[in-house]
Amino acid sequence: MLAMPSQRTAEMGEATMEDLKVTANGYDFKPAHAAMQRYVDGNLLAGISSAVLVGRDLVDVNCVGWADKEAQTPLRADHIFRIFSNTKLITSCAALLLFEEGKFQLDDPIETFIPQLANRKVLRPGASMLDDTEPARRSITIRHLLSHSAGLSYGLFDPGSVIFTAYNERKVLNPATPLSGMIDALADLPLTYQPGTSFEYSVAIDVIARLVEVISGQPFDKFIQSRILGPLGMVDTRFVVPEKDQGRLVAYYAGADLMDPMKPGLTRTDNSPYPGAYLKPVPRFNGGGGLVSTLPDTVALIRSLLPGGPTLLKPETLALLTDNQLADGVWLRFAMMGELKGKAYGLGGGLILQPSPIDHPDSQGEIYWGGVAGTQWWIAPKRNMAGVIMAQRQMAFVHPFSFEFKRLAYEAVKQAR
């Protein structure tokens, strides 16, 4: 039987605009605000909203620019964003709630629950044919899936590769099929590497969403509503924006040049990733990137993962979020960016083990992630701070604006101490 929401979540209340009132003073965020305004004035981003917490206290909330640049609609904190891969944190937390109930162990083979993923084949290094494989040396585990080390792919970021072609031909990402259909599409596709030996950003968290369905006996959207979104009061976080709220959905833009993120110019692209996205129901509850949300809702989620009050997960589970789950010597890697040395992955997001030149020096130990359109969150346990920043531009996950904001936010908190 599915457990009822815990006392921890039941005590958390509803995420409202009242929750976005600054409750601790003495922090100077004017440099961060001015920097974000420059991105808007430079026609690099239409609008940016942000919030920063020290402990559980909000020390800054800010909105600059437009929800709809063409209509000159000012961006407000209650505007709704396509959060894409920010969805992954909610999906990972959903699975970890079941883990806390003893429904599975992290190193359980996934075929215990999803038999179609047993007996995997793995592409040989340099393979140019889909059948150029070798047997997997071990099963995919739930830990591998939560940390993107299972050998799965997205079939998005490596055009021309054999796995890119296969994922697209099998329509692995097809929103017109349910999560069970995605599993069927993956069933006879090879892995890109031996489970547990590397990192590749992938549909692994969508597999986790299906795992939640199988274990709970509920559709994924119903589970997260009853166990996370409802208890946390995340009233605007869902897979489809209701018609009455569609006026609050911010416009979606593409930059002038994918390879030059600082080239001015924005083009409307509201029909991405497909016409009607987020406006009408589809069979796929995309646990890796299908939700919309708001600044208050995302702050409520992040606050629920911080010490000092009721938490969504137990303290020992929260500690797992900041434990590196990748093999020794394995770092994050993306097809268009290469290896990100010093960046690893936990059970809910990326980890900064060694800050890079574009990170603040105080960010060591930070857990973070974000969506492809520029919605990001981070938690810095060593600095007792956290933050959320939201924009809506294609391929803005690694846009300079977010790195600059985080550096300035860290500095504002540091200078106040």
Language model features by range: what are they?
Residues 1-16:
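Short, Lys/Arg-enriched N-terminal segments with co-localized hydrophobic residues
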Residues 30-37, 56-58, 82-110, 205-213, ...:
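Active-site SXXK
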Residues 361-367:
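Short, hydrophobic/aromatic-rich segments at coil-to-beta transitions
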Residues 393-417:
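Generic C-terminus detector
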